[in-house]
Design a protein with these regions (language model features):
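Internal gly/pro-rich beta-alpha loop/helix module
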Residues: 134-220
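Active-site segments that bind and position negatively charged phosphate/pyrophosphate groups
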Residues: 263-339, 347-348
Length: 410
């Protein structure tokens, strides 16, 4: 392993995530918060929910009640006046259903004088859920969508129609109370109706689109689930004010600043990356190979969210798969490729992402591992662990997509 490049990678990861932590972002957003004369309630959902809620209560002083639902091991302590729950991700579980039921109970019977502060971050589609269909069927549909390679917009178009809270229905449940929503964006282009499936946003997707997605991926649906795909979601909401705070653009900008501080010339390739993870990794490797003779220290950055089409039964995540796919293409170069999820988790693993450099391919071969066979089995986690290529941050408390970086040293 090239320790100089690895140390640079670790520094870039730390700096980029630090820049998009929710504490200061929440304080900025709440400068515009004007609650009504009645009760002020807090509901927070997503991977960053606990940190967002903690920052909000610290800023406001107190709330009259609240519910937080986030991933397992993401609650860091108690918050005055707020009940905190942990639940399943990326597949919703009974914890998701229970916590969301508590949130719906909390907002029942509100008046026009009351205000709901709704804090939303990525992961909310699984964590904040109360389905019309059975929990078991929703879990099965979610697994089908994850396995078939559907992108996040396609997944959420389906999930909205099966849910009592998605696609604007949570805001409807809060009415006539006002809803002030603060959103950490984890979807390219910041489409409010798609972030966590838009519980407090009018839905721009249509039944026609949902049915087309079900047909495209040959989803196995019950008669009731298929009927629900034909029921339109709310298209207007007059009780919601929304503020977006934090995005993949800020993540990439912070990474670029740190690259420059380390002596690299940063170049942002895109902040709208959306393709197969292994294709992105191979592309970044080809960029490094093309510029290997330039005599410059370069950093190529790409922000967004790739997808993985599952063909095997291994363990990994999209960032680990992206990095591993780059290893053969940079073999022997004074170069590295790494990719990390800003939330600190990548797939169902304890890693945030993966790192490879010009020495990785040889190290894998020495361990009896073939990159292409590992990718076929979707087992990037174990391969990268073998060569110390996992990036582990622990839960970060934020979630604004992923950043991939390709470094080239002279």
């Amino acid at each position: 392993m090239n320790m100089t490049l690895r140390h640079d990678a670790d520094a870039i990861v730390r700096a980029s995530i630090q820049a998009v932590l929710p504490d200061e972002a929440i304080r900025r957003a709440l400068a515009e918060f004007r609650p009504g004369p009645g009760r002020t309630l807090l509901v927070a959902a997503g991977k960053a929910a606990w940190q967002m809620a903690k920052a909000a209560v610290d800023t406001l002083g107190q709330v009259d009640g609240g519910v937080v639902v986030t991933k397992y091991d993401h609650v860091k302590g108690s918050i005055p006046g707020v009940d905190c729950y942990e639940a399943g991700h990326p597949v919703p579980d009974n914890g998701s259903f229970f916590a969301t039921a508590r949130a719906l109970e909390l907002v029942q019977g509100l008046t026009a004088d009351d205000t709901v502060l709704f804090l939303l971050s990525g992961g909310g589609s699984a964590l904040f859920e109360q389905p019309f269909v059975s929990g078991e069927e929703l879990q099965d549909i979610t697994r089908q969508l994850l396995a078939c390679g559907a992108d996040i917009v396609e997944m959420n178009t389906i999930r909205k129609r099966l849910s009592r809270v998605k696609g604007g229905r949570f805001a409807q449940a809060c009415a006539p109370a006002k809803v002030f929503a603060v959103v950490l964006s984890d979807i390219l282009g910041d489409p409010l109706d798609m972030i966590a499936s838009g519980p407090a946003c009018p839905d721009a997707s249509t039944c026609r689109q949902a049915l087309a997605i079900a047909e495209k991926y040959d989803l196995k649906l019950s008669g009731e689930a298929r009927r629900l795909l034909t029921v339109e979601t709310p298209k207007t909401l007059d009780n919601v004010t929304t503020r977006i705070t934090g995005s993949v653009r800020e993540l990439c900008a912070a990474a670029a600043v740190q690259c420059r501080a380390l002596g690299y010339e940063p170049m942002l390739l895109t902040d709208q990356l959306c393709c197969e993870a292994r294709e992105a990794g191979s592309f970044l490797a080809s960029v490094l190979s093309t510029h290997a003779g330039d005599g410059r220290r370069l950093a190529f950055l790409a922000g967004g969210e790739t997808v993985v089409h599952l063909t095997g039964k291994g363990l990994g995540g999209r960032n680990q798969e992206l990095a591993l796919a780059a290893a053969p293409g940079i073999a022997g170069l004074n170069a590295a490729v790494f990719s990390v999820g800003s939330d600190g988790t990548d797939g169902p693993t304890d890693a945030a992402g993966g790192y490879v450099d010009g020495d990785t391919n040889a190290a894998l071969q020495a361990a009896g591992l073939d990159v292409f066979e590992v990718l076929k089995q979707n087992d990037a986690y174990h391969a990268l662990k073998e060569v110390d290529g996992l990036l582990v941050t622990g839960p970060t408390g934020t979630n604004v997509n992923d950043v991939a970086v390709a470094l080239l040293r002279t």
